UniProtKB/Swiss-Prot annotation:
UniProt keywords, alphabetically: Cell membrane, Hydrolase, Membrane, Metal-binding, Metalloprotease, Protease, Transmembrane, Transmembrane helix, Zinc
Cofactor entry: Zn(2+)
A Gene Ontology cellular-component term: plasma membrane
Gene responsible for this protein: htpX
Record EC number: 3.4.24.-
PANTHER family: PROTEASE HTPX
Cofactor note: Binds 1 zinc ion per subunit.
GO biological process: proteolysis
Family per record: Belongs to the peptidase M48B family.
Protein name per UniProt: Protease HtpX homolog
Chief place of localization: membrane
Gene3D superfamilies, per the entry: Metalloproteases ('zincins'), catalytic domain
Sequence positions that bind Zn(2+): 155, 159, 230
Length: 298
């Protein structure tokens, strides 16, 4: 389920960096759209406008290609009964997603896909409710029973009906604006400490480095938002599939996560500085026990 967030953020960083590089090169060649003053300083308002344009173009471009990127990077095989014959299990998966989608009020059915992976995972993505994708791992279908699968699918459909990807795109656009603005200022400061003939190349390299670093730091804001929205998707999933199935799905995920943690405990411990704080900051999902507790109290 974290795949959706990580794919979106990775795509955003790549798109944002590419747009920034292209615009910077064009600006240096043509002089159009530059935020530098005649004396080599920075015009804050011009830089802010530049940052807003780059930031939101980057986030909405990431949203527009999110479904294609997910299929490409995860190797998702779309299940289309009109084009290919499906196995009984595959047809059942498509029927479940479509049934839940109709119950949620969607008028255009999401694409449904499977990707090969032993992990127990699923995600929903896409630029709009009418152009969405629900994908599940082969490991999820192999290790979860029908009730748990139903809960997971309902959770992912709830993400689509809640419009979480669009809201996240707006948030990412704001984060991107700060990233672009601060990275340009930091790069400009760095270029002031070298010889004048080296300043342009230092500014360019520093800009790329600072933009990537600030993008990673900015992703913490997106992660925090994602954790908040998971509770809403859990409630939406409970409304669609039933509270018992949603809780059962989360308990199954918890059981799976516990087995993985036990298998990898030694390796994980050697990398920890403060495991609890680190995982809470960089996690896209809240603690499973807390999610179960909130659903039980619903």
């Amino acid at each position: 389920m974290a795949k959706r967030i990580f794919l979106f953020i990775l795509t955003n960083i790549l798109v944002l960096t590419t747009i920034g590089i292209v615009l910077s090169v064009l600006s240096s060649v043509t002089g159009v759209g530059t935020y530098f003053t005649a004396d080599g300083g920075i015009d804050p308002m011009a830089l802010l406008v530049f940052s807003l344009v780059v930031g939101f173009v980057g986030s909405f471009t990431s949203l527009a290609i999110s479904r294609w990127m997910a299929k490409t990077m995860m190797g998702v095989r779309v299940l289309n009964p009109k084009k290919h014959s499906l196995s009984y299990e595959e047809q059942q998966l498509v029927d479940r997603v479509h049934r839940l989608s109709r119950s949620a009020g969607l008028t255009k059915m999401p694409e449904v896909g499977i990707y090969r992976s032993p992990e127990v995972n699923a995600f929903a993505t896409g630029p709009s409710k009418r152009r969405s994708l629900v994908a599940v791992s082969s490991g999820l279908l192999e290790q979860m029973d029908d009730a748990a699968v139903e809960g997971v699918l309902a959770h992912e459909v709830a993400h689509i009906t809640n419009g979480d990807m669009v809201t996240m795109t707006l948030l990412q656009g704001i984060v991107n604006t700060f990233v672009v603005f601060l990275s340009r200022i930091a790069a400009w400061i760095a270029s002031r400490f070298v010889k004048e003939d080296l300043a342009p190349i230092v500014h360019f390299i520093a800009m790329i480095i600072f933009q990537i670093v600030f993008s990673i730091l900015g992703s913490l804001v997106v992660f925090a938002y994602s954790r908040h929205r998971e509770f809403h998707a859990d409630r939406g999933g409970a409304d669609l599939a039933g509270k018992d199935k949603m809780i059962h799905a989360l308990r199954t995920l918890k059981s799976y996560s516990s087995r993985i943690l036990e298998d990898d405990q030694t390796a994980v411990q050697t990398l920890k500085i403060n495991g609890k704080k680190r995982s809470s900051l960089f996690s896209t999902h809240p603690d499973l026990d807390e999610r179960i507790r909130r659903l039980e109290a619903k």
